[in-house]
Amino acid sequence: MNISITFRHMDATDAVKIYASEKIAKLQRFLRGPMKAQVTLSCQQDRLHSVEVDIHAGHDHFHAHETSEDMYASIDKVSDKIERQIVSAKDAIRARRKGADRAAQHLPVDVGEE
């Protein structure tokens, strides 16, 4: 697991860095294999805090962006968005596999030549 955190237009604090790392690291449980995450934390002029997350895990890519007045709230919201994306992608894969199994059950069986 590789998590890279970048601060833009704000001072880097250990508390925010640790909080973001822990929230993103929890997403690893939904993924198979190693995960590489790029987290960008920024503060805009009008006191809005934005968080952008890119996650690469094998052939999968997930991206989310969130802006709010509180940095911790933005981190929570973006983590929830990524979690929903991962679960949705996994459910889609399961549905495709289940559909293939059902289609195979309805194929006619060749009993051979008589």
Describe each PLM feature range.
Residues M1-E114:
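N-terminal, polar/charged subdomain of small-to-medium soluble alpha/beta proteins
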